[in-house]
Structure formats: C-alpha cells, structure tokens
C-alpha cells in the first residue's frame, strides 16, 4: 500500500511464504540426512542383521567395539591416515597454487593437469594406481630396470606399504581440489604487500612466509579441517588397492572399511556396524570441532 492508500500491485506475502520455498530442500535434508542418522543411532542399540530385525541390546555393540582388536587396528590406521595425509594436503596444494599463479608460458596446461584427478572417478584412479604399484607394474618395472631392487617392492602385498600407497593416492587426488581453495585465497592477497616487501629487499621465500602464509592461514585451517574429515572417511583407495580383505590379514583396514566389512559382509551385522559408524562420527566430530576452534581462534 502506498502513502496515498493506493495498491502497489505487488503480490501480498504471508508469513509462511519463505518456508514454502525452503520446504523442498528441508524435506530432502530430513529424508536423506537426518532420518538415516537417527535410524543408525537406533540400530546401534540392537542386534539387527541384514536379513532380519533385531532386539534391543543396550550398549553391547559399543562394548564389543571397544574390546575388539580389529576396531582398534582400524582406528589406528584411520588416525595414522589423518596424521600423514592432512599435513600433505595443507602444504602441497598451497605450494602448487603459488607456482601456478606465476606468469610462466604454458602454466594453464599445468593448472588443468593438476585438477584432472579431481574430476576422475575414484575407482578409475584406484585402478590406475593399482596397475602402477603392483608387483609387475610400472614402478617395480622401472626399479628393476635401474637395478634399484632385486625383488619387487610389496606396495600392495604388505599392510604397511599398502596403507602408505593408499595415502599417496589420496594426496595425489586431493592436490588439485585444495589447490583451487588456495588460488581463491591468494587472489585476495593485496599485490601492494608483495610490492612493498620487494622494495624493502625481501626475496620470494621471505615474502612467502611473511606475507602469503599469514594471509592464507584461515584457508589453511579450513583445508586442514576438510582434509581431516576426508581422511577419516577413506574407503575406496583401501578397497581398490587391497581388495575386499583390506590387505594381508586386514592390516590396512580403516574404520569405514571395517563398517562395510561387518555390515555388508557375510555376517551382515547391521547393529554392530551402526555402532562403529557412530564411533567414527564422534571421532570425526572431535576433529571438526577442533578445526572450528582453531579457525575461530585465528580470526580472534
């Protein structure tokens, strides 16, 4: 209504109009996120299996997990994965982002090349690396031709080497993804800061540590949090490189791999798998909150 009392011609909005537009997205979140999570929590307190329902067993599944050596092996592998992979995915993409920002002929090709693994299927990436790392694969063939080894390096047949190989695949696939994050952050660094430092005699290395790193530190914390969550959820790399057993004796299994194995394997222990899933969720939540706290502390 105008000041003169006339009708503006604009449609009349009621209080529920915004909620009407939010409803489709809200329904999707409830259907595909909240409901599965609630159902997982409920099932974790039962002895349910794939082909039958289960009765309430209280905290038995959680007690079993905490007393299960396989659970602790998988937890140790997941935490080790995080400790190794996260620093690599925080530092290496930053170095790449700085390099591809340079005005070098043909640098556009390298930008695309670094990002290519991101858009490739995780299964395809795993199969490529399986061919590269197997006993008669590319790496071992080169090593033998150069007389660096007499026997093939057991990249895929030793649990420790398998875990390291999977870490390499994860880092390789994540480099281009997190490089884009850093490119966005570097674009917000004022060029005048580098120019002033150069005039004062600061070299490229000093400018990097004195200007670039402090300016992109919030992004480094974000990348650290995201890569930590991703590292705790790793499954495909272990499955493709190590097979359904998770390497020799299951020694390279991570928590997501263990969840799949007990929940969808021959025993089909859905209730126990859900309990392990909740424990993985809590572990992920701890690292997420830690990353959030560090980010807030940096902003303060």
Kindly give the residue locations of the regions a language model identified.
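Short, Lys/Arg-rich, polar N-terminal cytosolic tail immediately upstream
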Residues: 1-13
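A structural signal for multi-pass alpha-helical bundles of membrane permease subunits
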Residues: 14-300
């Amino acid at each position: 209504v105008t000041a003169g009392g006339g009708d503006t011609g604009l449609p009349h909005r009621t209080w529920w109009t915004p909620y009407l537009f939010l409803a489709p997205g809200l329904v999707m979140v409830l259907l595909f996120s909240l409901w599965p999570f609630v159902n997982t929590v409920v099932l974790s307190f039962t002895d349910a299996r794939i082909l039958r329902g289960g009765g309430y067993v209280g905290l038995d599944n959680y007690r079993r997990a905490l007393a299960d050596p396989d659970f602790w092996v998988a937890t140790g592998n997941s935490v080790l994965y995080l400790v190794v992979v996260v620093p690599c995915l925080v530092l290496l993409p930053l170095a790449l982002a700085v390099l591809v920002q340079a005005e070098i002929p043909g640098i556009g090709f390298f930008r695309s090349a670094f990002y290519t693994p991101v858009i490739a299927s995780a299964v395809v990436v795993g199969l490529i690396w399986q061919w590269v790392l197997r006993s008669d694969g590319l790496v071992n063939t080169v090593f033998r031709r150069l007389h660096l080894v007499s026997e093939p390096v057991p990249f895929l047949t030793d649990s420790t080497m398998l875990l390291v190989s999977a870490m390499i695949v994860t880092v390789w696939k994540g480099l281009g993804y997190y490089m884009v994050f850093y490119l966005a952050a570097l674009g917000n660094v004022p060029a005048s800061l580098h120019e002033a430092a150069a005039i004062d005699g600061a070299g490229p290395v000093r400018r990097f540590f004195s200007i670039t790193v402090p300016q992109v530190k919030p992004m480094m914390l974000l990348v650290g949090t995201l890569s930590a969550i991703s590292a705790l959820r790793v499954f495909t790399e272990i499955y493709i490189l190590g097979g359904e057993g998770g390497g020799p004796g299951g020694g390279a299994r991570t928590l997501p791999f263990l969840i799949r194995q007990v929940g969808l394997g021959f025993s089909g222990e859905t209730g126990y798998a859900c309990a392990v899933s909740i424990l993985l969720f809590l572990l992920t939540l701890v690292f997420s909150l830690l990353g959030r706290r560090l980010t807030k502390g940096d902003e303060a």
